[in-house]
């Protein structure tokens, strides 16, 4: 069966690329100050460390989202309107990542740290919900899926995204009281997704998915 999702995937890859570019634009070169030397520049750069950390974790998160998006579309061969809108919701939310990342970079060392982390983790709750919606739309009509995909494979992939929701939601709730812990939970989840893979058995039995 010929895949009907090539244009969706190409458009999605473009949006992911733009989202990463927006992150980079938040990395500002310090203003030149009269008389500054290498030691002074190093001090200025050290003061900017929240911005670098925010960029790194946000880039990593978008990369993990892109990997999951790529692998889920390996199992989707056809499209309908509901699936395209669900995918559009994912892209919309991913394109917003740069904004809470900028908030995190600017306010992490201030008294507003808690709110910046809450906004950041809240966005990823929504992104996870959008992924679950995408897979629900894909599996509601199995004719959209890859030929030969088993019910067990569908269930495994669904569960793979479902457990992300309570984890993100936990991080979101914790962020109101322990923002550092909330960020750590998100990072650990992304690391887990990056390192783990599940074997989903199709007719050829060779496919792996995160």
Where are these regions (language model features)?
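Multi-pass alpha-helical transmembrane bundle typical of ion/small-solute transporters
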Residues: 1-210
């Amino acid at each position: 069966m010929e895949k009907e999702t090539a244009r969706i995937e190409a458009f999605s890859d473009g949006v992911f690329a733009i989202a990463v570019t927006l992150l980079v634009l938040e990395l500002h070169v310090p203003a030149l100050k009269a008389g500054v030397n290498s030691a002074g520049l190093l001090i200025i750069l050290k003061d900017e460390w929240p911005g670098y950390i925010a960029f790194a974790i946000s880039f990593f998160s978008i990369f993990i989202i892109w990997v999951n998006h790529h692998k889920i579309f390996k199992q989707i061969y056809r499209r309908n309107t509901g699936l395209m809108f669900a995918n559009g919701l994912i892209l919309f939310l991913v394109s917003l990542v740069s904004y809470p990342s900028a908030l995190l970079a600017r306010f992490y060392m201030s008294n507003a740290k808690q709110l910046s982390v809450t906004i950041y983790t809240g966005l990823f709750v929504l992104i996870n919900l959008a992924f679950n919606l995408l897979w629900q739309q894909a599996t509601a009509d199995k004719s959209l899926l890859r030929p030969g995909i088993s019910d067990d494979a569908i269930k495994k992939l669904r569960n793979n995204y479902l457990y992300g929701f309570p984890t993100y939601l936990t991080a979101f709730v914790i962020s109101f009281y322990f923002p550092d812990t909330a960020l750590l939970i998100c990072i650990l989840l992304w690391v887990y997704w990056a390192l783990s893979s599940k074997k989903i058995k199709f007719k050829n039995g060779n496919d792996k998915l995160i």
